[in-house]
């Protein structure tokens, strides 16, 4: 004998059933609350990300600037900015933080502030990126890293300085349509990989009609319905086509990427910056 009558067992069964339903309802409620909180966090992260991006291209004597940014459905860590460095100089910055979601957006926001600080206190752009990398490592972002590239323009000089920290190749489109990779030998590791790494700057002579092209992997890795990436070869081919301004170069790239993707849902933010010298008239 277990001490329970049939009536007792029926009552216990009823209580158990009610308790089970109560637990299910509580779990469903908790999940709904968690989903709503996650949605609010994503919306906040998206607003933070959008607030850090430039609203219009800058003006700097002797240069024309075109930019494009479009967020993917998932929040990513793409970031670009224009940072004045005194009366005649301007830094064009582009970065891609590893990962997605709220945490990537937070790392991007911190990196954005750090970039402005290091470029403000260190005039030598290569040394500034070396300081930036050390700061990134000290921040303790676990296994996060960021690819990064900065181009420093000077309205009093034809020489442009480029420092790349593991970012995708920087391209120089010359006035004759030829395309070359900039700073391949000087390119360094991504930020957050080696705290002792020392970065180097490449120098590029930009004459009238030439354009420097910066982009994130939302461009180069855009997928079509066959799961084929857009790729760097196709990008270089499009860059070599006739174009009379940085805006024309940029729009031609965007049209071709869209043609390739043909409406496929993107998983990465798409960022493109083209900086050029006006063509001689």
What are these regions (language model features)?
Residues 1-15, 100, 200, 220-232, ...:
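Regulatory loop-to-helix N-cap segments in sensory/regulatory domains
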Residues 12-16, 167, 250:
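N-terminal membrane-insertion helices
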Residues 29, 33-213, 259-281:
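… and, occasionally, acidic/histidine-rich disordered N-termini of signaling adaptors
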Residues 122-128, 241-250:
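Short, charged, surface-exposed loops that flank catalytic or proteolytic processing sites
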Residues 1-3, 23, 97, 278:
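Short beta-strand-to-loop transition segments that serve as allosteric relay/switch motifs
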Residues 3-24, 109-110, 207-208:
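Amphipathic alpha-helical "output/dimerization" segments
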